[in-house]
Amino acid sequence: MGSNAPPPPTPHVVLVPFPGQGHVAPLMQLARLLHARGARVTFVYTQYNYRRLLRAKGEAAVRPPATSSARFRIEVIDDGLSLSVPQNDVGGLVDSLRKNCLHPFRALLRRLGQEVEGQDAPPVTCVVGDVVMTFAAAAAREAGIPEVQFFTASACGLLGYLHYGELVERGLVPFRDASLLADDDYLDTPLEWVPGMSHMRLRDMPTFCRTTDPDDVMVSATLQQMESAAGSKALILNTLYELEKDVVDALAAFFPPIYTVGPLAEVIASSDSASAGLAAMDISIWQEDTRCLSWLDGKPAGSVVYVNFGSMAVMTAAQAREFALGLASCGSPFLWVKRPDVVEGEEVLLPEALLDEVARGRGLVVPWCPQAAVLKHAAVGLFVSHCGWNSLLEATAAGQPVLAWPCHGEQTTNCRQLCEVWGNGAQLPREVESGAVARLVREMMVGDLGKEKRAKAAEWKAAAEAAARKGGASWRNVERVVNDLLLVGGKQ
């Protein structure tokens, strides 16, 4: 006799990214996987990010494709932020989010629950919050909704943040006085006690700990984030286990079950069950200049230096000039992604030497580009990067060596691992000088240093491909996360 039990309700997963492109992208990738497996997905923007997208791209950027709208919706919650707040003011963003978002997110969860009554709409079965968005976990726990958390940066960055408390206990943070912020001896303090990263120095820890304020917003927020993540049902990391094995193993002693699913974009590319409709969702406030791809088509294999410092990093006019002069004299063709707001407070005029290279067809400067496609283009032979995690994952998947110029946050931690552990990159001096830029670019493009780094980059590319393909380690973890965790309400 057949069972008369009703079918299980459709899973309804709410995803809450931090309002930054590097955070939104992996959560949207996860949304694609969930949507393709039949889940209803609610993707939550804060007003700040939503308004920035509207201003830059129009309503089409935040409207789900018609083919996906039945089970995919965008919701927006207030965050107390003005559009005048620069996106690189991470402390200001984080402080406003944690002060202002809990109440509106609570209200959203209540409303989503009330919509179920009398309608064919499933209740919320799981909340996936960015680790930075601690209010999402708090509201879910209050409502009795299972929740898991997604850390969108590197595992080594997470381990660095996890040890902020230890830095405070050992008297290293806050810095005793402002002079220590630039004291090389102090910044070189060894941190052999960090498990899985015994080669770390104080300067390699995520930079938000560099403060003299005992009540610093970013330090206190980080401590709160780590406590919240430790209490979650599970933790998703967009990393390659083989790349960060020692670090992930060290994290396992502090956090709930960890699922390494990276590079998530590559897992999606090898998956036959990622929502194609949601691939059209635009998450960038910058318009991609695709003419760079045809420009690359005309360059020899491995000849082009690709330069991009991400969606948030900024530099001074003097630093931009030194980079420009270094690229102009490096001897290789270059593609430089120079955002309109990459220079702090002023528009910088590019030097004649660089403009001459552009006029001769040996250089191209664009405001934004389809980075994953650029990195995989046969003409590209080097990536000059800020060491943001999404950029490094894309470089790993493309097998590109990296010349690093880390700017803030865990980029310094990523850089140390890149140079000392993974072996597929080298570092530029923090004080940018055109001669050093040109010299290091040449060494990476045609010297023995570059040969060594390219060989290691090729090894990591193969490892990433193996993990992401069907049956690989990251592919299997994605299947576990989606099918065994998120689609059944975060139960284990």
Curated annotation (Swiss-Prot):
Where does it reside? Cytoplasm; Endoplasmic reticulum membrane
Enzyme Commission number, as recorded: 2.4.1.85
Q: In which pathway does it act?
A: Secondary metabolite biosynthesis; dhurrin biosynthesis; dhurrin from L-tyrosine: step 3/3
Q: What class of enzyme is it?
A: transferase
GO-annotated biological processes:
dhurrin biosynthetic process
Record PTM text: The N-terminus is partially blocked.
Keyword Zinc-finger listed: no
According to the UniProt record, what happens if one changes residue 201 to A?
A: 20-fold reduction in catalytic activity with mandelonitrile as substrate
What family is this? Answer: Belongs to the UDP-glycosyltransferase family.
Q: What is this protein called?
A: UDP-glucose:p-hydroxymandelonitrile O-glucosyltransferase
